[in-house]
Each structure stands twice: as structure tokens, then as C-alpha cells.
Amino acid sequence: KYTVTSYNPLYEALNLISIKSYITTNIDNIVPLVMSNSKRYYLRDISHGPVKKSNTEIQFIPLHGYVTDLNSHLYFGKNELANVDSDNKDLFDAMHDKILNYPTLFIGYGFHDNSVDRVIANTITNPKQDIWVMCLENQTAEINYYRQLGCKIIIGDTNSFLQWVNETFTQKEKHVQTDPLNIVLNEYKIPDACNVELIPKEQYFQKCRTDWYCIFYNYPYVRKHVDDIREKLLSTKNIIVKGIPFSGKTTIAMQVAIRASNNYKLFINELTVERANYIINVLSNKQALIFVDNCCEDAEALSILMKCANLSVIGFTDDFVYESTKHKFDNIKISFINVTELESDEPYRIYEQIPESIRLQFSKVEQDEKCSMVEFINQNVRDSLSEDNVKELFSRIKDVSIKGFEVVALATYLSKNGSALNTDVLCSYFDTTDYSVIKRYISIAQNCLREMSVILEEDLADQDYYLLRSHVFVYLSIKVLMRHYKTEYQKIVKRLILNVSPYKIYRYNVFKRSAYDSSFFNKLFGNDADLLYQHL
């Protein structure tokens, strides 16, 4: 009933102005439909977690629900609307934050919703940014009222406003707007060898850091799967490469990527449905090769790319994740390549790549025996990441600062489940709004991790986010926390669940699938797991 399939073309004018967030009390899909065809923006529903700073991603905050979201409750009646700010507190808090920190335009909003008006009244009386309100010409009382509050006034209706934007900004945007294709290519491009961070070869093997520098300078052995994938690409457009965790899939993805000669090639780590549609819009009908790491974290998004005739797609995933999502690909022709454990002469070939200064005596793999990459590195590389030295590290961090210990434990829990540590999570977790306190805790954690050459670094795209680059460290940390610091880990995970809004957890839609896994929860919390599930 409230879903539309077409719209007034004047709405395309929204693509001409700079937008950071779209907040609405409407439940229809007009603006989302407009943005689904855009080459400048795409909407990202806040229920999926916060949005990193981006010139293309707009945070979408549907205060009363959203008609195309099957999990969204739609608010209609007087009684429901009277309490919607309580039911959707996180959405209203997000609205409050946006109005405080960015100039805001109220367009087509009648100020008849008490729940919304309470938040607006609080921000309008103490504005940090300009607030613009569009009123009809005959709304004299409203115009005078909002002017007295310090708001800027626009006289007109939605139609005339969009027409004005279209007439005013079209020519200007032609001169100043960056080509959307260049934006996409820059965001997802494979970097040049001369523009990547130098990683010593010893660190690659000891700390299991898979970075572009290591690939360009041939640190890892090139396994047969690289040629298998390249050959498969000659006869098929869609490939999924799957295998056990830590079997070298990401390394293989990067090795194939630097060898590909396609004019347009993209390497994507965090694919979403909205991002997939945006990339298709921008590429238009151009032929492109797209690599998607951890591709089954959003299988629907991957299927959208694979169905696009002009795109060749290679996805890389853990086999158990693929098995839980494979129904999403029922009607798509896909070739599969399985990345096996090390076999035959591969262990010795990899051993030859290890710098002599950190080589242990070669631990031979018997003819019929297989081993994982992690096992091989532990057996053949001096001072490599191991459960024992990660345990020692956590012991030292705890002695230095319990807050630093909690930061590292949080970072590993979030990273393990497809998310990332950010300052908003830490502020809620530690119940503080003092960013200097949070920065101090992060600095303590970083300094302790640096002792093992493990990096917790600011995300270059958004400095409110902190990334753990070593997946092996994350994996070993979870094992150590579960085995040796279970009581502390229980408290940390429980506090995260109780204190931190899902809307502050990056990629929450991905995070929640594994972070609250029943097997993990029962091991960690025992009989108390059900109480936490009730809260969730």
C-alpha cells in the first residue's frame, strides 16, 4: 500500500546537494527509491549499524518504520506515535546527534508529531548548527515562531524547492562534482606498488599480516589456486573460492587481483546490498572484474553483483559461511574452487620463502598429512604468533591497565564477528562522553600491543574507527580469553550487550549473526545465556 515504484523526476534534484543523513517520519520508500538509482549516493539504514565518514553513503533514519523492511514495525495510531520515541530510543538519539552536529533542513514536515517535536525543541533552543524550516506562504504564525527561535525560513512547498535546487545547482555541479566512476575506482582500487605501506618480510610471517606490499613483493608462495582461478575466469563470469579459515584465501585473492589485466577491477572487503546497487549504477554497462573478500557476509549483495551481465565476480569465503548462505545463489551459475590445506610439496615451497633469520628447522609434513597455514607457521617460524605468547601479552596488559585489557578484548570480539572498534562503542561501554579518556584507554592498548608488533590502527577512512590487521591475532585472542580469562571476558561481552546500542556497532547486521551464536554464548555464559538473549 505504501510502497511506490515510480516518483516525480524532480526528486532527482536530491543528487545535486550535499547530504549527510536522511531522517524521516514517513514510512514510504520514495527517497530510498530515488537513491537506489543514484550515481552519487546510496542510503544505509542505521539499523545495520553506523556509517563511516563517506561522500557517497547517507545514513537513513526512519523514525516511524520503513515499509520495505520486513523487520520494521510501522507506527500509525495515536497511542503508538505517542510512545515511538521510547520504543525507538536509539533512532531518536541518532536524530538528536545529527541535528546537533550538522545543518538541518526540515522539508515537508508539519511538526505535528509530539515525540519528534520533543527532540527538535531541545535542539532548536540550543542550536550548534543552522536549522532551516520550509513553510507555506500562508503559515504566518509558524514562520514568526521559528524565526524567533533562530531558525532560517524557506517559503515554498516541496515541489517548488526541488525545482529551485534543480535549476540552481545543475550547472554548478557539472563543474565541481567528481566523476562517480572515479570515486568508486579510487575507493575499491588495487593500489600501486609504490603507494603501499612497507611491511618487513619477517613481520609478514611472524605476525601474519596480509598487506598489499607483501603481495607485490612476493613474500607468500603462489599456490596452484591462483592459476586455477585465472583459468576458470576464461570460461565463467562468477566464481566462489571457499576453504577453511586461515587457508590463505585472502592472499590468493590479492595475488589474482594484481595479475588481472582488466581495465576496471575492484577489490571489496565489506559488501552491502546498497553498495552493490550503487557500484552497478556507477559502472553502467562497463565490463569490470570485482573481487569480494568475505563474500558471504552479505550473500544477497553478492548475488546482485553476480546477476549483472557486465560484471565478473570472484568471491572468497570460509566454507561453513557459504554452506549457511548457499540458498541465495540457487538461480546463479557459479564455478567453485576449494582452497585446501597444505599438501604435497607446498610446505617446503613456503618454507623457502621464510627469511633465514626467523626460520626454525623444517618441520616436515608427511606425505598423507595435511596442515593449516597457521599450524605450519607456528612449527617453522621463530617468534610467530602463538597461543602462549598471546596469553603472556594479555597478562601484561592486565597488569598495566584493566581498561586497556578491556579495549583489546572488545576489539578482538568485534573484529572476530565482522565489526570494528569505534569511539562511540567505547563511550557507551565506559559510560563517558569524555573523548580524552577514551583516547587514553586506546593509547594504552596500542602501546601494549606494539610490544608484539600487533597493530590497532586508526582507519584511514574514518579516524573514529580502530582496526586489528592480524586475523590470526584475533583468532588466538578469542581462544586465550575463553580459556584463561573467561570471567573477565564474560563481564566484557555482557557489558557491551547491556550498555551499547546496536546502532553504534559497525556492521551490526553482520556482527549479530555470529556474535550471539548459541554455542559461543552457552560456553561463555552457561545458564545465564538465556537472560542475555531475552535482553537482545
Question: Residue locations for each model-derived region?
Answer:
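Short acidic, S/G/P-rich loop/turn micro-motifs used as interaction or catalytic elements
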Residues: 68-70, 111-113, 139, 245-248, ...
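P-loop NTPase Walker A phosphate-binding motif
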Residues: 239-265, 277-284, 308, 319-329
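Loop-to-helix "switch" segment enriched in basic
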Residues: 357-401, 452-456, 465, 474
